C-alpha cells in the first residue's frame, strides 16, 4: 500500500514536471525561428533589373516576327543631312572643274591669245610673258565668274535651261565654223598676230629712241612716262594688255559666264584658271612649233562636239541636282 501510494504520488509530480518543461522546450525554438525568418527577409536583396544588352532567350526572340506582323517595325538608322550636303557640294565642284577646264582647253588652243603668248615667248623672256598673260587670264576668269554668279538671283531652273541653250548654240556655231575652215586657218591667224605684235614693237622702239639723247645737241628729248613703268617690265605690261583685250568678249569668256551661272562658281574659277594656265604654258614653251602643228580646224570641231555634249547632258541632269 505504501508502495502504491508512493507511485501514485510520483505520477502527478511527473506530469507537472512535463507540463513545466514543455513551454521551456518550445519557447527557445520559437524565439530562434522568429529572428531567423526576419533576418532572412532582411538579407534578401531586391531582384536586379534586367539588362537590355543581355541576349534574349529563344522564346522572346520568337515574338519579334509576331511584332513585325502586327506593325511593329525596327527603328531605321538616322542619316544626317550634313553628309549628303557635303557629298553633293564636292560633286558639284568636281563637275564644274571638269566642265570649265575642258571647255577652256578646246576654246583656247589655236585662239588669238594662244598665238600672242607663243610669238611673244619667241622674242622676249618666257617667264615674263607667261606671268603677264596668266595675270590677264586670271583676272578675266574671275570677272566672268562674278558676272555669271550675279545671275543666280534668277531661279536656277531658268538659268540652267538658258545656259543649256547657249551651249547648244555655241556648239552648232563651232561645228559650222570648223567645217568651213581651210586647213591654213591657223597660219592666217598666226600671221595676223605677228603683224600686230610687229606694230607694237615698232611703237616701243620709237618711244625708246625719242627718250634717248639727241645726237646733234646731246640733250635728251624725253617723253613723260608714268612712274610705275620704271618698276614693271614693259614686256609684262604688253603681254598683260594684249591678252586682256584679246580675251574680252571672246568665246571662252562667254562660256565661263554661262558655266558660272549653272555650275559651282569656285569649281568654274579654278578649272578655268587651270585650263588657261595649261594652254598658255604650252604656247610659251612650244612657241612656233606648237602653233604650226596645231590644226585649228580640228580643235574647233572638237570644241563644238564638247559644247553639244554639255547641252545634251541637260536631258539627264535635273536643275535641282546642284551640278
Curated annotation (Swiss-Prot):
Compartment(s) of residence: Golgi apparatus membrane
Membrane topology label: Multi-pass membrane protein
Region (Disordered): 35-60
Entry keywords, A to Z: Antiport, Coiled coil, Golgi apparatus, Membrane, Signal, Transmembrane, Transmembrane helix, Transport
Coiled coil segments of this chain: 184-211
Signal peptide annotation: 1-33
GO cellular component: cis-Golgi network membrane; endosome membrane; Golgi apparatus; Golgi membrane; lysosomal membrane; trans-Golgi network membrane
Similarity-based family: Belongs to the GDT1 family.
Protein name: Putative divalent cation/proton antiporter TMEM165
Organism whose genome encodes this protein: Rattus norvegicus
Gene (UniProt): Tmem165
